Regions:
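Walker A/P-loop
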Residues: 18
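P-loop (Walker A) phosphate-binding loop of NTP-binding proteins
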Residues: 12
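ATP-binding Walker
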Residues: 15
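ATP-dependent NMP and nucleoside kinases share a basic, alpha-helical "lid"
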Residues: 87-165
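Hydrophobic anchor at the beta1->P-loop junction of P-loop NTPases
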Residues: 7-9
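N-terminal phosphate/diphosphate-binding loop that engages ATP/GTP or pyrophosphate donors
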Residues: 27-93
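Small-molecule kinase domains that catalyze NTP-dependent phosphoryl transfer to phosphate-bearing small molecules
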Residues: 71, 116-123, 131-140, 166-215
Length: 222
């Protein structure tokens, strides 16, 4: 059954999914699920406890202690685990790499799938941001969007994001990692990064954040 209270935003990193989700939530008053943060949470806990044994990592996760909220200082969406804001720990490249490694494991995807599905009845509606939200996690969503952008633009956005965090970056290396991850994500056997058949594909390369939000609002209200 189609659910008109679920909107999914899929696409690779750096296309503006998180910003769009936040802006739509402001406009619609809906709850946000940033699924990528959940995978980065697993990567962070792996690094913190020096283990790649997912069974051990699972024991560190209290399902009741996972929630998202807006950060008023930088307008980002923060992931909390047991009242600890993980935002500053899960955004570095080492954690992102570990998150990608865990994301291909069926046991990890199955575990996080259940957590993500648990968000569907929270609030007035749900905006789910990820890579397989419209294809796997919420196939019943009425509104499905898939964002794209050039690798150059995505690398530029990531560079700005890292610089804001005080980190030095190499633009060429960033772009190479983006292209490498795209290839891995789109060709993996489990939940490949592809648009849902009924998703609307939008290239965000030349769209401002509010232009993108207005475009999506116009579509869902038409």
């Amino acid at each position: 059954m189609i659910d008109p209270k679920i909107l999914t935003i899929d696409g690779p990193s750096g296309v503006g999914k998180g910003t769009l989700a936040k802006n739509l939530a402001d406009e619609l008053g809906w709850t946000v699920l940033d699924s990528g943060s959940l995978y980065r949470m697993v990567g962070y806990l792996s690094l913190k406890h020096n283990t790649k044994d997912f069974f051990k990592i699972r024991k560190k996760i209290n399902l009741e202690g996972i929630y998202f909220k807006f950060n008023d200082q930088n307008s980002n969406i923060s992931l909390f685990l047991e009242e600890e804001d993980l935002s500053n720990f899960i955004r570095n490249e080492e954690v992102a790499k570990l998150a990608s490694e865990f994301a291909v494991l069926p046991e990890v995807r199955d575990y996080l799938f259940k957590i993500q599905r648990g968000f569907r009845h929270k609030g007035k509606g749900l905006i789910a941001d990820g890579r397989d939200m419209g294809t796997v996690v919420f196939p019943e969503a009425k509104y499905k969007f898939f964002l794209t952008a050039s690798s150059e633009e995505r690398a530029r956005r990531r560079e700005n994001q890292l610089k804001e965090s005080g980190l030095s970056v190499n633009m060429r290396n960033l772009q190479e990692r983006i292209m490498e991850r795209d290839n891995k994500d789109s060709s993996r056997e489990i939940s490949p990064l592809i648009p849902a058949e009924d998703a609307i594909v939008i290239d965000s390369s030349n769209l401002g954040i509010y232009e993108l939000k207005d475009k999506v609002i116009e579509i869902i209200r038409s």
